[in-house]
Amino acid sequence: MFVAVAAVVGLWLFERERRRSGLPNHTLDAGMAGVFGGLAGAKVVWAIEHMGREGPFFDLLISRGGLSWFGGFAGGLVAGLLVMRHHRLPILRVLAAATPALAIAHAIGRVGCFLVGDDYGVPSDLPWAVAFPGGLPPTTSPVHPTQLYEML
């Protein structure tokens, strides 16, 4: 759910910045391609990272869980660049317009990771350490909330 919220908010912010920057209407095509390419890249890289340990590659591709941030960034960038090139858009100006939206969308995604107890850090005795007994994977030991660190 947070992935969808992040995508909608990110595209909305990108569209606002696109208008402010005077970029053409079809610049949003690059943003949409970035979202779909990002989802595909995130799933493929996660499946590659976990195949063998958690199951065969193709089973992991169609599983409910698992996305890799780096795969999402790479897939989104490649897809967005292909659309920018196809439409002959000014790549650096489009990337500059997309950057704030990407940062906000990433922060929204990290809130989702925190709420489900995913991607946490190493054990810690600091006052803000958090336990995720229902997390993915669960931990009853207090750990660094790296999702929130990354959000900042």
Where are these regions (language model features)?
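A feature for loop-to-transmembrane-helix boundaries and adjacent hydrophobic helices
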Residues: 1-152
